[in-house]
Amino acid sequence: MRLKEQIAILALGAGFAACTPKPPPHIIEDNMEFAQQQLRFAFDEIDYAIVNESPESREKREKNGWGELTNPRNSEPDGTLNLVPSKDWTSGFFPGELWYLYEYTQNNFWKKKAQQHTDMLEREKVNGTTHDMGFKMYCSFGNGYRLTQDEHYKEVLLQSARTLATRFKPKAGIIRSWDHSTARWACPVIIDNMMNLELLFWATKESQDSTFYRIAVDHAKTTMKHHFRPDFSSYHVVDYDTITGHVLKKNTHQGFADESAWSRGQAWALYGYTMCYRETRLPEFLEQAENIEKYLFTHRNMPEDLIPYWDFNAPDIPNEPRDVSAATVIASALYELSLYDAEKGQRYKDNADQIMDNLTKHYRATLKKDNGFLLLHSTGTKPTNTEVDVPIVYADYYFIEALMRKNKLEKTGKLF
């Protein structure tokens, strides 16, 4: 560990009680109790949605071989719960929430529920049509293995990593994202893909196969080279020629415009490079994460409550929808980033605490309503008016993860 990091950890541990603005006195306990009650209600909502699935939805699933409905994704504007099969990129977040509740409570009720909702996803370990293996498998099986050391979970994760590695394009140095939209892109890579690298780093340590490490580092370095503008904002989509490795175009899919800063994309980048630094200790990854953080928190359009609008360049700010999911990802990333810089660490944690305080006070769902989700006001894909200003499962997952990180950090001064 570098001296700078050791000083950062000591300074944080000593300074939390004296320097940190005090959030509500029991923000962790209050939110975790709320989460337990709300997710118990969510099980009833899930059962109801399965029983009342429309014939059209069932026929479409069966025709395409998508399998059974597994986990919640979002609330629709009319209040109905949208459940997804395992193939959906969001299918791993709900089981991940359950594993965190088991870790926090040590109550076997949550362990059994987590196992049930995790096991539904096993078929995805050989699904080579997607880059989202980290989201789906590491949030679910990864948390499960961390807490249980179940050898079967380990094998599922290793196979998932092997499957993800098949999407690596060595000439370009990237992991391909989507297979769709071939008329628009040859080999698209989205900034979200930084989040899937943690599975590869884990697989390196568990298998002693450095191939996974090299793929993850190559992808992170190539993304750092081509996805970012001089101000350290990120493009959403970069398209590559897999033969020459050259960049073909830079676009957006979920942001306001090609040259805008889609908020959740910036959050994925912050989290991804913070994690990459943890796994590699390469200083360029820490520098990248800190530059992204600086971009976010000095941006003129960052709201006072630190809950971003869906795009930092959206045309009708302050009347644009917020994206709570971006805020939860940022908060979770900041708790980790606070460990790695002695001078800025306290500020990073203070900002994370402010985000969590404001989410708790102003963005939380109503108990035993809102389909059992924890947070309101996330935005999925505004350009197509999909999942706009609704509860979305990944906002809840990173909210609980941030609470767990805050709890560990304040009790032990470390996270891992």
Where are these regions (language model features)?
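Bacterial Sec-dependent N-terminal signal peptides
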Residues: 1-26
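Glycan-recognition and catalytic cores of secretory/periplasmic carbohydrate-active enzymes
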Residues: 22-416
